């Protein structure tokens, strides 16, 4: 699970590897101590998310996108079958957001990923199905999200903007 806002004290002296290792707590009988397999798994997950060169960097020295990747590595290091992400890009710029969704798309080849997001237009380029919840549940293949679906979910005063097409702001 990756929460929308992880409560991490930026002054706490912990490295990227330390954070990923925390995901191994409870997966072995070595309570409080990490073995060689734990360290190997943490290194592997940092490689998977493209942060192997930053493994010894303090968490406080990482960008928002790098921190999100560390937290994803922490969630993955316990080898889950399901990854649940709550607004994983809420504080990221567009470029880092795309990078993160590209990573999730790659990871989705191996495990089920559920993403909670309010940005249906952007997210729909990366997912297989969209489930909208607003007093009712709407399940749609990605290609079927149109203005009728959006109006049914959010009311008449919402405009749909497609991120993959040019649009006027006027």
Q: For each predicted feature, which ranges?
A:
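Conserved ABC ATPase signature
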Residues: 58-62, 66
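Conserved ABC ATPase "signature" region
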Residues: 21, 36-54
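H-loop (His-switch) and adjacent beta-strand-loop-beta switch element
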Residues: 128-143
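Conserved catalytic loops of ABC-family nucleotide-binding domains
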Residues: 103-115, 119
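ABC ATPase nucleotide-binding domains
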Residues: 145-170
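Conserved catalytic motifs of ABC-family nucleotide-binding domains
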Residues: 79
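Catalytic Walker B motif of ABC-type/P-loop ATPase nucleotide-binding domains
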Residues: 83-87
